[in-house]
């Protein structure tokens, strides 16, 4: 007896085998592409899954990871996510200062800028009667009279490599929930930018110790009405920083001068012992030229970059906290612009990504350390 054979069954079987073959091939191709796309980072992640503890900074693996940062000469060479991935991997390496690289960098800064001699206007570098050119309004000149001359220190209060370990604290949202306060406060000298809040609410993340705090005259104009009427609120804010020196760009332009001088008068009125210093405009001009040659193209370099550069001359070892110029942290999680608010800066005024990119390079070379993870100090 004959059996009916469906002619489509063999075709279905063949079709199923073909689909299976296509699926297997597709899976193999996707896997291969994934490995090509992730490249070195794929294997690094696999390596770190089984690793317990930090790697030595000069180990062969860490040298490779450091090159992953330093080989990127221009920020636009890599996607942001790729840069973050390389930076995250580098955190597995125990950072240590490279004395040779740090000294070379300090020598370069000495030749161009010389913070130990010219960071502030002093009676030594700006004698009575000096016709001082403004940083931006270069056609404008301020004649150093007896009244202003008396406000200057006789000479720079700090010397080259005077402090062993310094912390420069930016105001970036990367500091929120960082628990870096104790590590910041353990530094021998602490720089802070633009009157940041250091109240009990923030102390665990940002600490409280302050040796120098900068004040942008725009803050005095907007928050304290140029100190023309009520000076007590401004004085009360400064008390949060105890005896920290107050540093202002009095000679950035003509508008800044009167406001900055009022700060000195306000503190005198309340018999405050806090020193008031003014940035030397020529130091800032030289510094801007230097960083322009390093690829930082902006209307003005940030206060943070100024303080970091000065710290590299005044301190043996420099640690940065709160410096991050991207909307996400290295793990890809969105963060606020500042640790205390999410107010964005004026677009195009500073070149923050370029500044941070330079810091990452310097970290990788052992010149300074950039902290972006949760701290485990003390």
Regions from the language model: what does each represent?
Residues 2-378:
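Metal-ion/cofactor- or nucleotide/acyl-coenzyme-handling active-site neighborhoods
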């Amino acid at each position: 007896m004959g059996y009916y054979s469906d002619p489509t069954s063999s075709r279905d079987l063949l079709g199923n085998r073909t689909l299976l073959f296509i699926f297997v091939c597709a899976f193999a191709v996707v896997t291969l592409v994934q490995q090509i796309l992730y490249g070195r980072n794929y294997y690094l992640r696999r390596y770190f899954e089984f690793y317990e503890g930090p790697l030595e900074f000069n180990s062969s693996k860490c040298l490779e990871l450091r090159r992953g940062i330093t080989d990127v000469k221009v920020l636009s060479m890599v996607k942001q996510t790729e840069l973050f991935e390389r930076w995250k991997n580098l955190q597995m390496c125990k950072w240590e200062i490279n004395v040779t690289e740090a000294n070379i960098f300090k020598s370069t800064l000495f030749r161009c800028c010389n913070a130990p001699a010219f960071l502030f206007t002093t009676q030594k570098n700006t004698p009575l009667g000096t016709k001082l050119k403004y940083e931006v309004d270069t056609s404008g000149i301020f004649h150093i009279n007896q009244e202003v001359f008396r406000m200057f220190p006789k000479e720079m209060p700090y010397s080259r490599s005077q402090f062993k370990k310094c912390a420069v604290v930016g105001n970036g949202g990367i500091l929120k929930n960082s628990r870096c306060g104790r590590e910041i406060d353990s530094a021998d000298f602490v720089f802070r930018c633009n009157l940041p809040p250091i109240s009990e609410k923030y102390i665990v993340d940002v600490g409280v110790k302050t040796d120098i705090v900068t004040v942008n005259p725009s803050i005095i104009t907007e928050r304290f009405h140029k100190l023309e009427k009520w000076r007590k609120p401004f004085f009360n804010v400064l008390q949060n920083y105890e005896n920290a020196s107050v540093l202002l760009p009095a000679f950035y332009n003509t508008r800044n001068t009167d406001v900055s001088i009022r700060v000195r008068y306000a503190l005198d009125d309340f018999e405050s012992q806090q020193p008031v210093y003014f940035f030397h405009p020529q130091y800032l001009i030289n510094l801007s030229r230097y960083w322009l040659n390093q690829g930082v193209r902006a209307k003005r370099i940030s206060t943070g970059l100024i303080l970091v550069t000065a710290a590299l001359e005044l301190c043996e070892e420099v640690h940065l906290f709160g410096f991050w110029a991207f909307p996400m942290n290295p793990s890809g999680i969105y963060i606020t612009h500042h640790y205390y608010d999410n107010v964005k800066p004026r677009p195009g005024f500073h070149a923050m990504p370029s500044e941070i990119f330079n810091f990452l390079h310097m970290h990788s070379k052992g010149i300074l350390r950039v902290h972006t993870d949760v701290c485990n100090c003390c």
